[in-house]
Design a protein with these regions (language model features):
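Short, well-structured N-terminal submotif of metal-dependent ribonuclease cores
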Residues: 1-46, 62-71
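Active-site neighborhoods of divalent-metal-dependent phosphate/nucleic-acid chemistry enzymes
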Residues: 3, 81-99
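A general alpha-helix detector
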Residues: 14-15, 53-57, 75, 92
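A general structural signal for well-ordered alpha-helical segments in protein cores
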Residues: 27-30, 51, 90
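Hydrophobic helix-cap positions at the C-terminus of alpha-helices
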Residues: 36-37, 76, 96
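Short, conserved alpha-helical segments within structured domains
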Residues: 46-50, 86-89
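Active-site-proximal, substrate-binding regions of enzyme catalytic domains
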Residues: 55-81
């Protein structure tokens, strides 16, 4: 009998370390993990609250423009290994946030 694949729940820090590359220890680990998710080697879900937290930190603390934030987060949500059942709704909300 084949067991179901593990689905990882990605938190805000993993997303931020991956996108910002600002931590000497954790950013490379996040990059390796997210590379596997991008190729579908690992399956993962990113809750909508994590997306909201990422937006807040990138906009308020790092002063990243909305268009860049939306581009980065949309890119991640379109990784092969992302299994969010509400992916289309989150992507639509990102577009509304941008405008």
């Amino acid at each position: 009998m084949k067991l179901p694949r593990k689905v990882y729940l990605i938190d805000t820090n993993v997303v931020l370390r991956y996108l910002l590359g600002d931590h000497p220890e954790f950013s490379p680990k996040a990059e390796t993990f997210m590379f596997d998710v991008s190729k579908g080697v690992k399956k993962a879900e990113i809750l909508d609250v994590v997306i909201v937290e990422c937006i807040y930190v990138m906009e308020k603390y790092y002063e990243i423009p909305k268009t860049e934030i939306v581009e980065k987060l949309s890119g991640i949500l379109n990784f092969s290994g992302i299994v969010n059942p509400d992916r289309s709704e989150i992507l639509e909300a990102l577009l509304k946030y941008e405008n």
